[in-house]
């Protein structure tokens, strides 16, 4: 597989350089191996072709190859679980829902909203859904890279929005090439901030480490470049199963938006540093030039961060190397003593490639139903097998895991503080600046921010 395949299949987070950092045990002393429950699992991904004749025809034509299907992202709305599958030759549909039907590999996938969107010859369908996100207004946002095999641009990159109540397409926005400057659709991350149904911001990152901001109100795009988004290539090795990868490009992945502080957290896959920027400054950035302040937290994490998500109470949950999930509460200062481990499992947490926090408990699986306010949804795979393209189709290779957030952090350092508010957060946050480095001066010194606004040529309905 190519370097991009290695990078993108695991969302740029599989190439973790495990340097022997020690992740502390959970402060509660509880057993961490079973804190996450298995909701769905697959030996390989298969699809609901309606009948066996259709499946056999897809296999014979090369439309479907069970060894080429790798899930990249997961999200859930009521009883629908969405699964994004990166498009390689042999992937019949990139955007799917998990059906009630079961095949030999696991639950069958159904193209969403139907098979017509899985066809892309005329560029009206979805080529490769790299990231998906569901907002508070019951809309599914889909970032389509337009690439096949991660290298072949078939169509322009696009942003789709679907009404989940009707499964109707609300908007299909072509991302202009002068905004996605690579011209190859190499867009790799997606986060949505919906102030209301019209005033919605969509944050994306391209493979040149540039933040692209889409404003739903007027269908405009603009770019923000910063050296915090631009990391040099490192030589790094993944010691899991003796797998070694060298000279893999650093990219920005795993963005997470806090509903408490409105901070947008991000990091490069080989970095132990965490960066963040407040989205209020991003909203003003189009007109205010360099008035965007980026913060960097360094020397806090024992190993590299992977994907992450933030709860409604400000608990940042994130993956680390060594098969663990950890947490930090935004109401506390960001230092080592306030970070805790909430899950560890060498099998199910070998590599977490997607993480979401949802408001309703899934309809299947063993997730605790006693508190229905929030639960963690995580997608994991067998890292070394995916990277080496040698999946053992007799073993479980992909899993969707879940846990009630309150149960997950109970008795940990991240347990919610009901008597704390954002003022207390700001006080502690300011105290933590000794471990945070403001990059605003560096931005001005290096003149490394570039802005570009563009009105896109969109095809969309007027009811959005």
UniProtKB/Swiss-Prot annotation:
Recorded coiled-coil stretches: none
Signal sequence, start to end: 1-15
UniProt biased composition (Low complexity): 438-447
A GO cellular-component term linked to this record: extracellular region
Induction or repression: Unlike other major royal jelly proteins, not down-regulated by the ecdysteroid 20-hydroxyecdysone (ecdysterone or 20E).
Family assignment from sequence similarity: Belongs to the major royal jelly protein family.
Tissues with expression: Found in and secreted from the hypopharyngeal glands of the worker honey bee (at protein level); expression peaks at 4 days post eclosion. Expressed in the brains of adult worker bees peaking at 12 days post eclosion (at protein level). Expressed in the spermatheca of adult queen bees (at protein level); Expression levels are higher in mated queens than in virgin queens. Expression in the head of forager worker bees is lower than in the heads of nurse worker bees.
Glycosylated sites: 26, 31, 79, 149, 165, 242, 322, 368
Ranges where the record places region Disordered: 419-464
Stated name of the protein: Major royal jelly protein 4
Biological function: Component of royal jelly, a substance produced in the hypopharyngeal gland containing proteins, free amino acids, fatty acids, sugars and other nutrients, which is fed to developing larvae by worker nurse bees. Major royal jelly proteins (MRJPs) are high in essential amino acids and probably have a nutritional function in larval food. All larvae are fed some royal jelly (also known as worker jelly) early in their development but it forms the principal source of nutrition for larvae destined to become queen bees.
Biased composition (Basic residues): 426-435
Intracellular or extracellular location(s): Secreted
Record carries keyword 4Fe-4S: no
Provenance organism: Apis mellifera
Principal cellular location given in the protein's record: secreted
Pfam families noted in UniProt: MRJP
Highest taxon in the source lineage: Eukaryota
Keywords for this protein: Glycoprotein, Secreted, Signal
